[in-house]
């Protein structure tokens, strides 16, 4: 019987996982797709820069395709997303065209939130922005309200909370915004809006969030001042951006699935190559180390301003731990797979201060508790986190991704270490960030 089989079921795809009775080990080397956060930003900055931007290693998943689709509709020339090298002919800052159609961000919150910062400052242009059913229920007020403080004219459904959105571009004014949450999307949206203002736009956060926008904006020529002590970033407007060559490293959020899988499956050893290890993203490595994982960075290097390494991971005996606070923004997307690690660890793991997971592609706290619970995991759900009693064997079950890519992949890893058959409904969600995930899983499971 095949370890993995993917079949169409009604209007969705169903993944069946049949681990052998003796268990399965993962061996070999692999590369994960390009970093999703960096891919979005490279496309956007290329579109608003002057001249040509060449992007190598771009994630060819559904979310960056949504970004490319939106910016093509506003006049940017972006080559087809089907090769290792993508070429963007930029319009120049403030020169995006008014589109003749609705801008559809698909499932991508990053596309919608960051793009709003650019649209708000496109004078004399009207934009309508929407997304899929999931995105139309994710909160947009967190970027709309500070943009309105800058003078933006934005209308949103449900009293300013949700897409669809209408944006009337206007001249924005700089502000100093104290964000109530540490969010790279909020910060990036406002920095992009600040590019066209006359003066300094500053964003101060309660904790450090990922800094890909700051690194890339500086590479494209924007003038920024960064204060790591107060978690503040200032962009000095108006800016002039020039097209660049961008090499996108592998996505640590995608690598996390392999790091956990090889840790919990006895006899496993994987080398995950070319992974971005930006310190604003490495919370997952710190928590796994705290749990006793055997992960070694090799061949550390800098690639177009981003730290990169190959990560060697060997099977180990994990122990439960507690994490929360300032580390959460540095591993927010990895919590679903860390919950799987916790289910296979000895002892109790407690995840705190993670209420942001309730407004991701799904309510990820509820999804983890529900779907891992169906497999026999002992998960207690709190308003802002989870408690997981590890060490009890999981059993195969019929579960659902809830159309969330990270839930789909986390459940597949849990299924490999479970007894009996697992069926994952709506498994096609994985293609949002990792189109080759199931194929790669089949390869490394064969050794």
Curated annotation (Swiss-Prot):
Reaction(s) catalysed (UniProt annotation): 3-phosphoshikimate + phosphoenolpyruvate = 5-O-(1-carboxyvinyl)-3-phosphoshikimate + phosphate
SUPFAM superfamilies (alphabetical): EPT/RTPC-like
Chain positions recorded as 3-phosphoshikimate binding sites: 36-37, 41, 183, 185, 333, 360
EC class (word): transferase
Pathways involved: Metabolic intermediate biosynthesis; chorismate biosynthesis; chorismate from D-erythrose 4-phosphate and phosphoenolpyruvate: step 6/7
Primary residence: cytoplasm
MF-aspect GO terms: 3-phosphoshikimate 1-carboxyvinyltransferase activity
Family the entry assigns: Belongs to the EPSP synthase family.
Entry-linked NCBIfam families: aroA
Protein name: 3-phosphoshikimate 1-carboxyvinyltransferase
Gene giving rise to this polypeptide: aroA
